[in-house]
Amino acid sequence: MKLGIHAYAWCSEWNNTQLDLIDRAQRLGMEFIEIPLMVLDKFDADAVSGRLRSLGFDACTSTVLLDDTDITSGDPAIRKNGVRYLKDCVKATADIRASNFSGVIYSKHIRQLDGKPTEREYAWSADSLREVADYAEGLGVNIGIEPVNRYETFLVNTCEQAIMLKKMIDRDNIRIHLDTYHMNIEEKSFYDATILAGKDLMHYHLCENDRGIPGTGLVDWDDIFKALAEIKYTGYAALESFVDCTGNMNTWVWRQLAPDGDTLVSEGTRFIRSMMKKYGL
C-alpha cells in the first residue's frame, strides 16, 4: 500500500506557491501527494510535473463538481460543460504523469433535493462518466468514484452505490475511492464496505471521524486494515484532514484539529504505518 497526504493538510487552494508542499510531503516520509484540481486555471502542470520528476515523487489528483459542471443537471449545456471539465482534469492528471483521478465527480458537491435521486439522474451521470472514461483510457488514467456523506451528495453515499454506478458506466478504468470519514457516517461496517470494493478499490482516504489525526478518534482501524489485508490492497491511501480553516473550502471545520499540517502528517503516519505493519501491508 502506498501512503500519501492530501495537499489540504497545509493549504486551502492549489497554485504554484504550493509547489514546496511536494518537497515537504517527501521529507515527512510520504510516497505521494494528492493534488486538488478545483481551480484548473491555477494548476501549472509543467511546474508540478517538473517538481515531481526532480524528486522522483508520485502524485494523484481529485476534484468535486460545482453548479456549472454538474453532470446530473437537467440542463444539457451544464452536463456538457461538466464532461469538458472532467476531461480537462484527466488531461492535467496525465500531464503530471499521474494515473489516478477521483473525487465527487458524479454530481454537484452539495446539492439539495426535494426527493430521492431519480433513474434519469443516475443515467445522466453514468453517460457523462462513460465519455470521460473513454477519454481517460487513452491517457492511461483511472477514475475513482468517491462515495461521500448525505450532507455532501445525494447520489453516491455508500460503496454499494458506487459499484452500482460503476456497473452502469461499464468501463474498466472506473474504480472505487473510499473515505473513512464518510464511511463512518454512511456504512454499516468499514470491513464490509472495503471487502465489497475489493479489486475495484483504487484509492483510500484515511481520516478520523472528526477529520483529526488518525488513531485519535472513533474509527475502527482494525476493521479497516483487516479488510485491506484480506483484499491484498497495494493501491494509494492518503491522509486527508483539513488543518488550514481560513480558505475557500467547504470542509465545515471550525476549529484546529491538529497543531499544524506537519504534526498531522507525522503523528498520523506513525499510527497508520503501525497498522500497516500489524496487518502485513
Can you describe what each PLM-predicted range is?
Residues 1-7, 11, 15-27, 97-99, ...:
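Histidine-acidic metal/acid-base catalytic patches
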Residues 9-11, 37-39, 65-68, 105-109, ...:
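Active-site-proximal loop/turn and secondary-structure-junction residues that shape catalytic pockets
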Residues 26, 53, 94, 137, ...:
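Anion (oxyanion) recognition and catalysis
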Residues 31, 35-126, 234, 238-248, ...:
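Structural motif corresponding to the early beta-alpha repeats
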Residues 32, 144, 176-180, 238-239:
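Generic enzyme active-site microenvironment
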